[in-house]
Curated annotation (Swiss-Prot):
Primary role: This protein binds to 23S rRNA.
Protein name (Swiss-Prot/TrEMBL): Large ribosomal subunit protein bL21c
SUPFAM superfamilies noted in UniProt: L21p-like
The species this protein was found in: Cyanidioschyzon merolae (strain NIES-3377 / 10D)
Listed NCBIfam families: L21
Length: 107
């Protein structure tokens, strides 16, 4: 495993920078903890050589394991209309999935 190995992967409508052997919090994925998932939409892979997709790399994938499901910190939204007695306070917590990225194999 190269210390500079990384991949840019598109999942859940966002692009993430993944390094092997680390864990990341991404948008909720509907699967059980312990399940293995495979990301096929790889945009960029730096492993033994640099591979750039146009837009995606064919026959390339990144494997991960779901560690747990969690919620993000609460985001508060406060809506107030000046000179009126209208005040509303909303709070929301995003559902997240913590994943572990497995080491990359051959390109």
């Amino acid at each position: 495993m190269s210390p500079t190995a990384y991949a840019i992967v598109e999942t859940c409508g966002k692009q993430y920078w993944f390094q092997p052997g680390r864990y990341y919090d991404i948008n909720f994925i509907n699967a059980e903890p312990g399940d293995k998932i495979i990301f096929h939409r790889v945009l960029w892979l730096q492993h033994q050589q640099l591979l750039i997709g146009r837009p995606f790399l064919p026959n390339t994938h990144v494997e991960a394991t779901i560690l747990q499901h969690l919620k993000s910190k609460k985001v508060l939204v406060y809506h107030m209309r000046s000179k009126k007695k209208t005040r509303k306070k909303y709070g929301a917590r995003q559902l997240l999935t913590r994943i572990y990225i497995h080491p990359f194999h051959g390109s």
